[in-house]
A protein has these predicted regions:
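Conserved Walker A/P-loop ATP-binding site and its immediately adjacent core
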Residues: 36-37, 46-71, 245-246
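Conserved helix/coil segment N-terminal to the catalytic DExD/H
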Residues: 83-114, 125, 129-130
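Conserved RecA-like P-loop NTPase helicase motor core
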Residues: 98, 267-362, 367
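Post-DEXD/H (motif II) to motif III coupling segment of the RecA-like Helicase ATP-binding lobe
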Residues: 121-186
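Conserved helicase ATPase core of P-loop NTP-dependent helicases/translocases
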Residues: 63, 79-88, 249-256, 260-296
Length: 437
């Protein structure tokens, strides 16, 4: 398989970092092809008789990623360790973290030369730590690499205990400009509750979603959500994010009352039922899927071209994950009758106002630098990790590199970017009360 240029660069940079540090994390947005990149990295570094462990946190991803891996590396055998199968024979073993972290499975685990963690912002969780510690007990020289779109966790905990460097970061804006993701067409819609949402209490991980439900889950607001959706995206496959299960059910019911084929997915939805619903969404039997936070990760349905946010996001990473579900491009061979030029984002929760752009960092160089040897890096003053030179935020501890590039950034914005012409946001005042522009 031929990698895209940015994928090849990311794989090369990760390999260089592994030679130096024995660990690294790669930051790449939804749609960048993380599974392809991790597969290519394994293939690049694989040696005869090596054992590689690939860890996923969702059941449906284990076999999906193993199949993609085999297309990239047909000469490296794979096997599965999950709730229904325990096969340790493969040269590359794909496993679900919940299964592998159980004591009896840890006891049967073989020695590994490399561990790859998908959605690696979860790597400091207790279940992952049990696995990593056992792997290191068996082989202290094991290489550990992580791939994630959102390294900055909502709870602000750093990843330093697992990764001491970020070898490469791919930005959403870059992939949109190069045609590998579609651009978001974003509408921030005021339904008269903006001030109330801004005053919602924060918890450790997010806003208090019970309070959000009391503000947002009203028949009049739900009707407005459907009306605006019909006006701006009524012919599009859509994923809706709500605050609670009750909120999601009420929004789903409102869609159905409007004769829209809609289903709900929650954390309690059985795995097979969820797979069927998402299959039906992708293939046109369902138009809208309403969920709480189930579809923020590990969900791949390229025909989805509308994202509706009926809740605020206290952390930028959550917003990026949600909107990212709609930015994938279409493979004409898989979906020959689907045309997708952009993704409509309807933000009723004012997340866009809070967080702005989807990119976590800004490239102050203004043009792609010529690569020769190792990618340029800088040292984070907070945790001493190596991170890409262009990063505005440390992927390991969350430190913001604000002051160093402020003057250059202001010059860049003022001279190179017409924010009025290029802004993806549009305000809509539904109540003519002057609270929107």
């Amino acid at each position: 398989m031929i990698l895209r240029p940015y994928q090849e660069i990311a794989v090369d940079d990760a390999s260089i970092a592994l030679n130096k540090h024995k660990n690294t994390i790669v930051v790449a947005p939804t749609g960048a092809g993380k599974t392809i990149m991790l597969s290519a990295l394994i293939g690049k570094r694989y040696k005869k008789n090596n054992k590689v462990l690939v860890i996923q946190h969702r059941d449906e991803l284990v076999r999906q990623n193993a199949e993609k891996f085999s297309r990239v590396n047909p000469n490296i055998s794979t096997s599965i360790v999950d709730g229904s199968e325990k096969d340790w024979s493969g040269q590359s073993i794909f496993s679900m973290v919940q299964t592998l972290s159980r004591p009896n499975n840890l006891d049967n685990m073989c020695k590994f030369d490399m561990v790859v963690i998908d959605e690696s912002h979860h790597a400091i969780a207790e279940t992952y730590q049990r696995i990593i510690n056992r792997v290191k007990e068996a082989n202290n020289s094991v290489e550990i690499v992580g791939f994630t779109a959102t390294p900055n966790r909502g709870d602000k905990k750093g990843l330093k205990t697992v990764f001491n460097n970020c070898s490469h970061q791919i930005e959403i804006g870059t992939l949109i400009r190069e045609g590998f993701l579609v651009p978001p067409k974003t509408f921030v819609i005021d339904v008269g509750v903006t001030e109330d949402l801004q005053n919602v209490r924060r918890t450790v991980s997010d806003f208090d979603m019970g309070e959000v439900e009391r503000i947002m889950n009203k028949r009049a607001i739900n009707e407005k959500v459907i009306d605006e959706w019909k006006d701006k995206a009524g012919d599009r496959k859509t994923v809706v994010f709500c605050s609670t299960v009750v909120h999601a059910q009420d929004v789903c019911d409102e869609y159905r009352r409007s004769n829209v084929r809609a289903e709900i997915v929650t954390g309690e939805t059985p795995s097979e039922e969820r797979k069927q619903i998402l299959h039906d969404l992708e293939h046109g039997d369902i138009q809208v899927v309403v969920n709480v936070a189930v579809l923020t990760e590990g969900f791949d349905a390229p025909p989805v071209s509308c994202i509706v946010l009926t809740r605020p996001c206290s952390y930028k990473s959550t917003m990026v994950q949600m909107i990212g579900r709609g930015l994938r491009t279409i493979d004409p061979e898989e979906h020959p009758n689907v045309i997708k030029k952009d993704c409509v984002v309807l933000d009723f929760g004012t997340s866009v106002l809070t967080h702005g752009s989807l990119d976590e960092g800004v490239n102050l160089e203004g043009a792609e630098a010529q690569r020769s040897g190792e990618a340029p890096v800088k040292i984070c003053p907070s945790c001493q990790s190596e991170v890409p030179l262009s990063s505005r935020e440390c992927a390991i501890c969350g430190h913001e590199f604000g002051a160093e590039g402020k003057e250059a950034l202001e010059d860049f914005v003022m001279t190179e970017v017409d924010l009025m012409d290029r802004s993806p946001f549009r305000w809509i005042d539904l109540f003519n009360n002057g609270r929107c522009m």
